[in-house]
Amino acid sequence: MTAIALTIAGSDSSGGAGVEADLKTFSALGVYGAVVTTALTAQNTRGVFGIHDVPADFVAAQINAVFTDLDVGAVKIGMLANASTIDVVAAALDRYRPRNVVLDPVMIASSGERLLREDAIGRL
């Protein structure tokens, strides 16, 4: 049986980070990857030009869709963007109790732009 991992993170339009990079890693390791997208970013190797947060209720809907259908063995958490999303993800982890969780919160892009709202830092 193929192992299943879920990435909960932002989407990087250049493919160098976020869910796109996580899926590449999962695939290279022979793991089936599922995705919950928390934010859409307009970025490239030079910088971040825009961030659109996915509404927290839609993040919750994505998480529920994955966990009610797939046997997720591991969850990797990246960009959460805001306090509402952090709360939704925390509640889902408490509800579904995945066996393995990696918390790798992305707070600042490699180009220096803030990816986590300052008022959400304490929620982590």
Predicted ranges, named:
Residues 1-74:
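Small-residue (G/A/S/T)-rich helix-start motifs and N-terminal tracts that mark the onset
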Residues 74-77, 81-124:
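Conserved beta-alpha-beta core of the PfkB/ribokinase-like small-molecule kinase fold
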